[in-house]
Regions:
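CBM-like carbohydrate-recognition segments
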Residues: 19-33, 38-119
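Short, small-residue-biased leader/transition segments that mark boundaries at the very start
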Residues: 2-4
Length: 119
């Protein structure tokens, strides 16, 4: 249930000696929020493309692969963020700004759903 971009910490990072690239829910949450904002500022068909991709990412973040169960994960909403891979710190961690941008993106989704159909 993970989208095609699969939320890598860096989309251009080379694979390291057989080790998988760490996932980064925070990057996905930030991207989804930004794309939802951008979808309201550009013309069609780009608006729909950005909105649909953001919604795919949010569905992925809401899946059991990234969403923590209530009370788990030190009470953070999202699991599997990467803070600073080059320094080998905050790998597969819960990061507060991941939750912030996730909630921001969800609020933007709600605002889009509340728009009149003509917009």
């Amino acid at each position: 249930d993970v989208c095609s971009s699969d939320l890598d910490w860096d989309y251009d990072a080379p694979e390291s000696a057989g080790a998988p690239t760490p996932r980064d829910a925070s990057a996905g949450a930030m991207m989804a929020s930004a794309l939802l904002e951008l979808s309201g500022l550009v013309a069609e068909p780009a608006a729909t493309k950005y909105r649909n991709f953001a919604l795919d990412v949010l569905r992925s973040l809401a899946s059991p692969a990234y969403a923590a169960k209530a009370g788990a994960n030190s009470h953070f909403l999202l699991m599997h963020s990467t803070g600073h891979l080059p320094a080998d710190t905050e790998i597969d961690a819960a990061i507060n700004y991941a939750d912030y941008y996730y909630l921001e993106a969800l609020l933007r989704c709600r605002a889009l759903a509340e728009l009149p159909a003509s917009q």
